A protein has these predicted regions:
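Single conserved hydrophobic/aromatic residue that forms the stacking wall/gate
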Residues: 1-5, 9-10
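Short, conserved loop/helix-junction motifs that constitute active-site signature segments
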Residues: 18, 44-50, 131-134, 152-156
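Catalytic metal-binding/acid-base residues of hydrolase active sites
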Residues: 29-30, 60-61, 97-98, 113-115, ...
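Conserved beta-sheet core of the metallophosphoesterase superfamily
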Residues: 45, 139, 145-222, 226
Length: 226
């Protein structure tokens, strides 16, 4: 979310109107510091899912882009962000998973810490996150879509990965975005065999306080048993 300019950009009523089983947030809740979240907490804590609201950390959530006096101060900022999410009723999946049960079926929802190519941080541990999910349908939240080709496709059977990160570079004109030159998978649905990736382009902005064509979005995904 970061600096979205106004809390009106976040429509908790629109999200709740979907009556979702799960609400998932794939990272970069702030741009630099945990206090950016404070004005949005009254809205975000109203977002509900029948089976909960889950999140993962993105590269900005670690606050690596500002100068901290000490490593301890930076760590305290991250812990503050985690605490604020917990207070909102969100559960962060840091290289972990939960098992969800519906009508006799089980789905594994897993999440990893940011797993990016340099210079972005890589704290993700995919194998740890998936341990114990063998044979289940798996949804993986991983902030950076480059994780898909780097590790998820070659080393796992995750059926659906959900990412963010690209923001579509906040610009899209007639379907063209410069994000395509940096991220092969930068917006929407991608498939390789029986595995899929969906990249959501987020709500807020970074550096430039505007979006052109790459409008803020939420994504509604319906899973069908086949």
């Amino acid at each position: 979310i970061g600096l979205v300019g106004s809390e009106m950009c976040i429509r908790d009523s629109l999200i709740n109107a979907q009556h979702a089983d799960l609400v998932l947030f794939t990272g970069d809740l702030v741009n630099n510091v945990a206090t950016e979240l404070d004005e949005f907490i009254p809205i975000l804590e109203q977002i509900k899912g029948k089976d909960g609201v889950y999140s993962v950390l993105g590269n900005h959530d670690y606050s690596p882009y500002i100068k901290w006096e000490t490593e301890e101060a930076q760590e305290a900022n991250l812990n503050s962000l985690k605490s604020k999410q917990a207070a909102m009723g969100w559960k962060i999946l840091n290289n972990d998973h939960v098992i969800l049960h519906h009508h006799g079926d089980s789905i594994a929802l897993a999440g990893v810490e940011n797993s990016g190519n340099p210079p972005f941080p890589n704290y993700g541990d995919l194998q740890k996150a998936l341990k114990g999910t063998e044979g289940m349908y798996k949804i993986l939240m991983s902030h950076d879509p480059t994780h898909w080709h780097r590790e998820v496709l070659p080393e796992s059977d995750v059926q659906l990965m959900l990412s963010g990160h690209t923001h579509e570079m906040q610009f899209s004109l007639f379907g063209f975005s410069p994000a395509k030159f940096v991220y092969p998978e930068h917006n929407g649905l991608y498939q390789e065999g029986k595995q899929s990736l969906f990249v959501n382009i987020g709500l807020g902005y970074l550096m430039f306080p505007m979006r052109l064509g790459a409008w803020p979005e939420i994504t509604v995904i319906t899973l069908h048993k086949i």
